[in-house]
């Protein structure tokens, strides 16, 4: 698994600064996550039969946080390695580096999946075909 990008994918835990009034979770760019967020979006209203994502990004890094409900995230590196993460606490997330295939699924009815991205949206940096992704990964691996 030399240079496997999925090995760089990791769970992150955020500070819960709450008190008797409730919870307050803080996520600061460049401190709690390894980039300054340029884009924020969220996914909700998906049920447990829906699969979202199904792409890799050439230039964007992400942190995904289920701020409500739960979901699962499968990451793949194009070299046969994969890992599944369960997101079910609003103070934990998953960091996903560039060029990692991601699929989000098994959404609970109340799921709100918050996504922080390191770049502004650019449709050209998305790889939406898995075979094309595997080819790009293998080409990059052959240069090492």
Go through each PLM region and give its residues:
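Non-catalytic, conserved peripheral segments adjacent to functional cores
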Residues: 1-92, 109-110, 116, 121-132, ...
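Well-ordered alpha/beta subsegment
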Residues: 89-93, 99-106
């Amino acid at each position: 698994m030399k240079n496997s990008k999925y090995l760089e994918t990791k769970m992150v835990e955020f500070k819960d600064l709450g008190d008797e009034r409730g919870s307050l979770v803080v996520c600061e760019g460049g401190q709690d996550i390894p980039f300054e967020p340029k884009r924020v979006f969220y996914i909700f209203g998906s049920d447990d039969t829906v699969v979202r994502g199904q792409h890799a990004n050439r230039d964007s890094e992400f942190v995904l946080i289920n701020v409500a409900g739960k979901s699962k995230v499968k990451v793949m590196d194009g070299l046969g390695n994969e890992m599944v993460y369960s997101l079910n606490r609003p103070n934990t997330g998953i960091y996903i580096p560039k060029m990692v295939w991601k699929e989000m699924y098994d959404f609970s009815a109340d799921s709100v999946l918050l996504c922080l991205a390191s770049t502004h949206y650019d449709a050209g940096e998305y790889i939406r075909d898995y075979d094309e992704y595997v080819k790009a990964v293998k080409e990059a691996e052959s240069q090492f």
